[in-house]
Curated annotation (Swiss-Prot):
The active site is at C408 (nucleophile). One of its GO terms (biological process) is rRNA base methylation. This is Uncharacterized RNA methyltransferase SPy_1606/M5005_Spy1319. One of its GO terms (molecular function) is 4 iron, 4 sulfur cluster binding. S-adenosyl-L-methionine binds at Q283, Y312, D333, D381.
Amino acid sequence: MVVKVKQKIPLKIKRMGINGEGIGFYQKTLVFVPGALKGEDIFCQITAVKRNFAEAKLLTVNKASKNRVKPACSVYETCGGCQIMHLAYPKQLDFKDDVIRQALKKFKPTGYEQFEIRPTLGMKKPDHYRAKLQFQLRSFGGTVKAGLFSQGSHRLVPIDNCLVQDQLTQDIINKITQLVDKYKLPIYNERKIAGIRTIMVRKAQASDQVQIIVVSSKEVRLANFIGELTKAFPQVKTVALNSNRSKSSEIYGDETEILWGQEAIHEEVLDYGFALSPRAFYQLNPQQTEVLYGEVVKALDVGSKDHIIDAYCGVGSIGFAFAGKVKSVRGMDIIPEAIEDAQKNAKAMGFDNAYYEAGKAEDIISKWYKQGYRADAVIVDPPRTGLDDKLLKTILHYQPKQMVYVSCNTSTLARDLVQLTKVYDVHYIQSVDMFPHTARTEAVVKLQKRV
């Protein structure tokens, strides 16, 4: 390797990497530089040298891209929550198209060069879109602060005005830090593994109802805290306590107790409403969720005789879009509270053809097929890790005629398509910008069993 740590070098940025970093070559060495844009001439300092590449930090931009903009966020460079806020928004959408192409080129699923990759669907106003926040709490010189850990560290960056966070949720977390200070509530101590470590605030866009989870390693007295908070913000309908005594970086423990208020808040998507309990998964960008789920509906051609499996179903929100026009919908999720919500939601909407069960998709689908159930179509919306290998084998064994893959990680999507394209043709990939100013995107893939 021709470069060394701390060495300062000039660099011409040739392209953008999948994490939003600029990529250039210095004497044939591949160098990744966060904050740099394609076409720029920069000066940077090497921070790490690996076997096949090096990493560097941006020092100066000698020739700026015409697509560079000044980020409005005061903590953009230290927070790490957003990666491409310095790139003009229309070009962010182009970047996300390219991220999909890069992933496909790396894994090379059958026929990938002919896949139709449709332009990413963006937002008219790509700010204050996050309806959910999960901030860590720490004590700074005796004062409580809330925020996010800086990229790749355990150093908290206090945030009191996040530009991608819904304003009400930001106002509530700001009030929470004041009240935690006021009532001297115990703040998490990493050495002792004790105290309040995380606060989750989620708002339902349709109803303006808010739920809060306090994540703590031990019981905390919150009566006065709850009383003052709910008086200041009547939109708060639920306060729950999640017990997490683990030393790991997992945000939540297994036990969640409603301390105050109702069990769920009311949300709506595609003209139907549903209950959302504190631990149930739901997309964090409600405006774009309408777009995303609308694309899922377009991608499946089903009718009154068809049966659908909605894997990783959460509270049932995707499957409900089909329940009124198909023979049956079955879904599963590993979070029991989400399945309870799905069952209640189906009953409330009169969908007696919808059935939900708690457990792993790879286990439950196999069980259903052994019991004689046959799906004409399957919808998968897995976490960033992609499809479990056992689930992939199950799908390829039973081969439902249609499939829609909703992905939040283009790399694991491309990896899974290597297996799926042995049986299925990819009709198109439609990217939806669920996370403006970040390097992440969501993609809807329409697959049809090959004849």
